[in-house]
Every structure is written in structure tokens, then in C-alpha cells.
Design a protein with these regions (language model features):
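Anion-binding alpha/beta catalytic cores of soluble intermediary-metabolism enzymes, centered on
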Residues: 39-85, 89-187
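HotDog/MaoC-like acyl-thioester-processing domains
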Residues: 1-38
């Protein structure tokens, strides 16, 4: 027996021994549970509608070396939300895109060696006014934040904050969470 996940990767492999009953077994028919299919995109249409008429913002995407980061970039670009600049090891970014069938045509890439360098270059782009926002890719949050709050980063005399959107299928609305791991004890 082989069981695979949604990406076709083997997660369990082994042998199953089936012991068939010697006598016929009858079981009462059970009522199946109700199945609900959620349209995840529909949950965000009201937020996307509020962006209509706004210009796409220049976005520095830091170390997008995984499928999710690249798909997010492409979808946000196609929706007219961002004009991305990918910052990271170009060969690795292009390899992931090719393996996942993601088209990066027309998207700028700044080739840097590793995630620390990507964070530093992305922060510099914002500081120089060449990007208006940062998007975290496949690097640790502390790598990005150490550049953001560093002496040559983006910090000011004001408090820094952030927000992330959690898609909770059992909650009827998008859930916005602020200050996770940034302001651990806000007043």
C-alpha cells in the first residue's frame, strides 16, 4: 500500500494484510454527514473590492523560495495589488517556479546569495523609496525583523506593528491578528 499527500509525495508505504470474514456481515445504513464546500476566495471579495481604483504598490518580496510565496506574488500581481521585486537566490527562485509551473515572466528578481542578504536588500529598497512594502517569503521572521529594526533598517521613534490574516474555516469572517511576536506585551 502507498498513501500520498496532495502533492503526490509518499507519506506512508507498507503492506496491508486483509482478513476477510468467513460469514456475510450486514450493517445498518448510516446517515452521512452534511458536506459544505467553502469558497475561500469569496470570503475576501469585500476586502479586494476596497482596492479597486488604487494603484498597485511596489513590493519587495524577501526570499520567496517556496511554492506558497511565489503563488501569493503571482496572484497579488494578477489582481493588480502589487508590482513585485523578488529578492533572493535567483537560481533557487526560478527552480521552484519551474517545478511548480509558476510563470514569473515580467517579475523582477534581484539575485542575492542567502536569506539574510535578501532581508537586508529588501529593507534597503524600502528605505530608498523603491518599494513601499515588504512581503516575507520562506525565511525566518527573526531574519527579516532584525533587518527591519536594525540601525540601518526602517525603525523610527514610533512603535512597530504588523497584521496577518488568518483563514479560519469555522469562523465566518477573515481574522486579523496583530503584534504576534512583535509587541508581546502591548499596552
Amino acid at each position: 500500500c502507498v498513501c500520498t499527500n496532495q502533492d503526490g509525495q509518499t507519506v506512508i508505504r507498507g503492506t496491508a494484510e486483509v482478513l476477510a470474514p468467513t460469514e456475510k456481515i450486514k450493517r445498518a445504513r448510516i446517515e452521512l454527514p452534511e458536506v459544505t464546500l467553502l469558497d475561500r476566495e469569496a470570503r475576501y471579495q469585500h476586502l479586494l473590492a476596497r482596492t479597486k481604483g488604487l494603484a498597485a504598490i511596489p513590493m519587495a518580496v524577501v526570499h520567496p523560495c517556496d511554492r506558497e510565496s511565489l503563488l501569493g506574488v503571482v496572484e497579488a500581481t494578477q489582481a493588480g495589488l502589487i508590482v513585485p521585486t523578488l529578492i533572493g537566490p535567483e537560481a533557487k527562485i526560478r527552480s521552484v517556479a519551474e517545478q511548480q509551473g509558476i510563470d514569473l515572466a515580467g517579475i523582477a528578481i534581484i539575485d542575492v546569495e542567502h536569506s539574510h542578504a535578501a532581508a537586508a536588500r529588501a529593507v534597503a529598497l524600502v528605505r530608498e523609496g523603491k518599494a513601499e512594502a515588504l512581503m516575507k517569503g520562506s525565511l525566518h521572521t527573526d531574519e527579516l525583523m532584525s533587518e527591519v529594526v536594525g540601525i540601518n533598517g526602517l525603525r523610527t521613534a514610533r512603535r512597530i506593528s504588523h497584521v496577518f490574516l488568518a483563514d479560519v474555516p469555522t469562523y465566518p469572517k477573515p481574522l486579523l491578528i496583530t503584534d504576534a511576536a512583535i509587541n508581546v506585551a502591548p499596552d
